[in-house]
């Protein structure tokens, strides 16, 4: 079984000179889920949406082409794709000739689907930037914080008040790569219906990820599971939009199956 320590993270590697799908490094999701007590049926649906900013290949005549792309990896795939391996794989296309852009899209989708173990959707282009911002930020709350990890779900609670439906946001989520220790920065959005979630407790909880080492996808699943367990909303959506690194950013989303309408798809201003 592949582990994060087996990947190219934190290692000096030569950039590929030709197309090489074996560069893609899948990591089974099961281990990360076991760490947060998810061993049976998943309490969520969702996907990991990647934005690729540095995509290039050669056309049939050898002329370089450039593009951006959006990749959708379903969260029920057996494996996630490690980010550095995805960067190296996409770079392996740089000197490869394709007869059409559609051939490139199909090749990427096929290779990612094979490694993830489920159908991965690939489309050219990127979502628009969310210049307005959905929901209400909790970042201006005036409170003292001195707990930066590990994530502490005990901060989470809901008030015994009538049910609300609201969207809460924070730009203060930070976690760290479990292999290299590099910081991962994100804006996080929680949309839910249920008893009002205590906002101070939610902010303290999110800040308690600051020294925590875990992959992006696992952080979002931990947040979803902790909020669901501690606050018992009728339904819940959690999305984190991580900042770009190596020409890629990742946006994991986990949602209750009963959500009436999905979140709009946007990029964050920091991406």
From Swiss-Prot:
This protein's pathway: tRNA modification; tRNA-queuosine biosynthesis
Main location per the UniProt record: cytoplasm
Transmembrane segment boundaries: none
Full protein name: NADPH-dependent 7-cyano-7-deazaguanine reductase
EC number: 1.7.1.13
Organism of this sequence: Xanthomonas axonopodis pv. citri (strain 306)
Family from the record: Belongs to the GTP cyclohydrolase I family. QueF type 2 subfamily.
Highest taxon, organism lineage: Bacteria
Location in or out of the cell: Cytoplasm
SUPFAM superfamilies: Tetrahydrobiopterin biosynthesis enzymes-like
Catalytic machinery residues: 177, 184
Covalent S-S links between cysteines: none
Keyword NADP appears in the UniProt entry: yes
Sorted UniProt keywords: Cytoplasm, NADP, Oxidoreductase, Queuosine biosynthesis
Reaction catalysed by this enzyme: 7-aminomethyl-7-carbaguanine + 2 NADP(+) = 7-cyano-7-deazaguanine + 2 NADPH + 3 H(+)
Binding site for substrate: 81-83, 216-217
GO cellular component: cytoplasm
Quaternary structure and partners: Homodimer.
GO molecular function annotation: preQ1 synthase activity
Residue numbers binding NADPH: 83-84, 245-246
Function text: Catalyzes the NADPH-dependent reduction of 7-cyano-7-deazaguanine (preQ0) to 7-aminomethyl-7-deazaguanine (preQ1).
GO terms, biological process: queuosine biosynthetic process; tRNA modification
Keyword Cytoplasm annotated: yes
């Amino acid at each position: 079984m592949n582990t994060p320590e087996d990947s190219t993270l934190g290692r000096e590697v030569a950039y590929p000179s030709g197309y090489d799908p074996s560069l893609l490094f899948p990591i089974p999701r099961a281990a990360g889920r076991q760490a947060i007590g998810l061993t049976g049926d998943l309490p969520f649906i969702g996907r990991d949406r990647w934005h690729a900013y540095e995509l290039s290949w050669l056309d049939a005549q050898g002329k370089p082409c450039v593009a951006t792309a959006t990749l959708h990896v379903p969260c029920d795939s057996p494996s996630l794709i490690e980010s550095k391996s995805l960067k190296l794989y996409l770079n392996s296309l740089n000197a490869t000739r394709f007869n059409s852009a559609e051939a490139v899209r199909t090749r990427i989708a096929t290779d990612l689907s094979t490694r993830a173990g489920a159908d991965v959707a690939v489309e050219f282009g990127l979502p628009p930037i969310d210049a307005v911002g959905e929901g209400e930020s909790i970042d201006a709350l005036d409170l003292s914080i001195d707990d930066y990890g590990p994530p502490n779900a005990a901060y989470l609670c809901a008030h015994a008040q009538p049910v609300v439906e609201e969207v809460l946001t924070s730009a203060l989520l930070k976690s760290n790569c479990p292999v290299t220790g590099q910081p991962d920065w994100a804006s996080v959005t929680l949309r839910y219906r249920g008893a009002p979630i205590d906002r101070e407790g939610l902010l303290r909880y999110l800040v308690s990820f600051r020294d925590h080492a875990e992959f992006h996808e696992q952080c979002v699943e931990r947040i979803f599971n902790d909020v669901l367990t501690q606050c018992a909303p009728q339904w819940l959506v959690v999305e984190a939009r991580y900042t770009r690194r190596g020409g890629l950013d990742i946006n994991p989303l986990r949602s209750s199956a009963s959500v009436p309408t999905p979140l709009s798809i946007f990029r964050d201003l920091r991406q």
